Design a protein with these regions (language model features):
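Flexible "cap/lid" subdomain of the alpha/beta-hydrolase fold that forms the substrate-access gate
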Residues: 2-4, 26, 62-98, 102-285
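Short acidic-hydrophobic surface loop/beta-edge motif
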Residues: 5-11
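A short loop-to-beta-strand scaffold at the N-terminal edge of the catalytic core in hydrolase folds
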Residues: 11-20
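Conserved HGGG/HGGXW glycine-rich cap/lid loop of the alpha/beta-hydrolase fold
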Residues: 19-66
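Signature tryptophan residues that serve as conserved aromatic anchors
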Residues: 33, 37-40, 102, 108, ...
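Active-site loop/turn elements of alpha/beta-hydrolase fold enzymes
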Residues: 59, 126, 292
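Catalytic active-site module of serine/aspartate enzymes centered on a nucleophile-bearing elbow/loop
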Residues: 283-328
Length: 328
């Protein structure tokens, strides 16, 4: 496992563990759930070689970063401020965001909240979700008697008890279940609302080619304090929607690129935002579906992701555009 330079950056009232490599324009790589900065292990070297400074945090609640206990510490305003604080600490006025999953949700909001700081956004798996109603993802009545993990995560202590019981097994099953190697959309297969997160999911044996025991060693280290911090992001969904209500009619006008796997469960859970991605990000330079890929594009399909990312970045150099924010 390659060792990278690590900085502990104090910003926004917390300390964040950030891998920092290279020099040049700043790329800020934001992971989602249940990951850590280690998600981007296949991207860092290629981006540094292309002439960029790369900053890869364990976001708050994750890995080697601080993990506030309060749910209120994980709203979108604070998560967005963390990203800007990293850029400030590294001396960059502007930066480009490279994001995945929850990192994409944060990245889209950073682009809206700090339009003059964000040059561009390259997002994987999750499109702009601006305008999602309060409760849309967190209230059981919206889903009948069907289990939905975003609702399950609202119950204090319940998900932690399940997932913390065997962290390695939990991660192994979660990573596999939303990948392109698992039965198509099996993660979204109907099960009763009384179910647990891992019920019905497959524990892979052997591991898929893109996930090694060494990788799991690192992830287990990153989750040594359990799942509470990461799950608190979900418990703050409605709080974040309320705090960013003023953004509901805004559009992301920075150059952007979106990519999703054809077998990613987000195709089901976020069908409406996916249908509106070009409307919500009118300066979209690419809207790509990787056939046969699942949710973990940076590790399932690193070559395709890196090629698309480097091509997008090269296009920014040849045709720079100023960032702005508009309503419509």
């Amino acid at each position: 496992m390659k060792q990278h330079t690590i900085r502990m950056i104090e910003t926004n009232g917390i300390r964040l563990k950030v891998v920092v490599e290279g020099s040049g324009p700043l790329l800020l790589l934001l992971h989602g759930f249940p990951q850590s900065g280690y998600l981007w292990r296949n991207q860092i070297d290629d981006l540094v070689a292309a002439g960029y400074q790369v900053a890869v945090p364990d976001q708050r609640g994750y890995g080697g970063s601080d993990k506030p206990a309060e749910v209120e510490a994980y709203d979108l305003l604070q998560l967005s401020a963390d990203a800007v604080g990293i850029a400030d600490a590294l001396g960059h006025e502007t930066f480009t965001l490279v994001t995945h999953d929850w990192g994409a949700i944060v990245g889209w909001h950073v682009a809206l909240l700090y339009p003059q700081r964000v040059n561009a956004v390259f997002a994987l798996s999750v499109p702009p979700t601006i305008g999602t109603p309060v409760g849309a993802l967190t209230r059981q009545e919206n889903f009948g008697d069907n289990f939905v993990y975003t609702v399950y995560f609202q119950r204090p202590g319940v998900a932690e008890a399940e997932l913390d019981a065997d962290v390695r097994k939990s991660l192994r099953m979660l990573y596999y279940s939303v990948s392109g190697d698992a039965p198509a959309f099996g993660f979204m297969r109907a099960k009763p609302a009384s179910s647990k997160m891992l019920d019905g999911l497959v524990d892979p044996d052997p591991l898929p080619s893109w996930l090694t025991e060494e990788d799991l060693d690192q992830y287990c280290e990153d989750y040594r304090d359990g799942f509470r911090g990461p799950i608190n992001w979900y418990r703050s969904i409605d709080r974040g929607i309320g705090l960013t209500r003023r953004l509901q009619q805004t559009k992301i006008t920075q150059p952007s690129h979106f990519m999703i796997g054809s077998l990613d469960p987000m195709n089901v859970l976020l069908a409406v935002p996916l249908a509106n991605v070009e409307q919500n990000a009118p300066n979209l330079r690419g809207n790509v579906v990787l056939e046969g890929a699942g949710h973990w594009l940076p590790i399932e399909r690193p070559k395709e992701v890196n090629a698309a990312l480097l091509d997008f970045l090269a296009g920014l150099k040849s045709a720079p555009q100023s960032a702005s924010i508009t309503k419509g």
